[in-house]
């Protein structure tokens, strides 16, 4: 944490094909070792697969999937009197989308299809329908928060 001033947020440029900032952020999340062109190819390939499979606008599917996967609450560990409690806290909007993107990436990685573009396309389609690995992760996080609701008075 800086002592002098608040560090400004970096502005992310929208992606070249769709002009969407969320898609550009997702590409940055997917990117490994600074290879943005590879991440771009994966995302656009996944969007092509979505267009062929669902006959819908890929951006629409992407935003629906993101909306479905975004968590509302999560748990944070808090130490009180020698015991650790999992305290449910609300997730701020920027972290919501960051978590959703990470979960989509991880769920896509674990899938069995041949190419990453296919895996990502299928994961996005499933997430848009409310199923899949990323949705499972979200439900798990929500379940944890629900189970530890009794400790919500230990606010941060």
Swiss-Prot record:
Keyword Phosphoprotein: no
One Gene Ontology cellular component: small ribosomal subunit
Gene Ontology MF terms: rRNA binding; structural constituent of ribosome; tRNA binding
Keyword Nucleotide-binding on entry: no
Origin: domain of life: Bacteria
GO biological process: translation
InterPro entries the UniProt entry points to: Ribosomal_uS7, Ribosomal_uS7_bac/org-type, Ribosomal_uS7_CS, Ribosomal_uS7_dom, Ribosomal_uS7_dom_sf
Keywords: Ribonucleoprotein, Ribosomal protein, RNA-binding, rRNA-binding, tRNA-binding
Function per UniProt: One of the primary rRNA binding proteins, it binds directly to 16S rRNA where it nucleates assembly of the head domain of the 30S subunit. Is located at the subunit interface close to the decoding center, probably blocks exit of the E-site tRNA.
Subunit structure: Part of the 30S ribosomal subunit. Contacts proteins S9 and S11.
Family label: Belongs to the universal ribosomal protein uS7 family.
Protein name: Small ribosomal subunit protein uS7
Gene name tied to this protein: rpsG
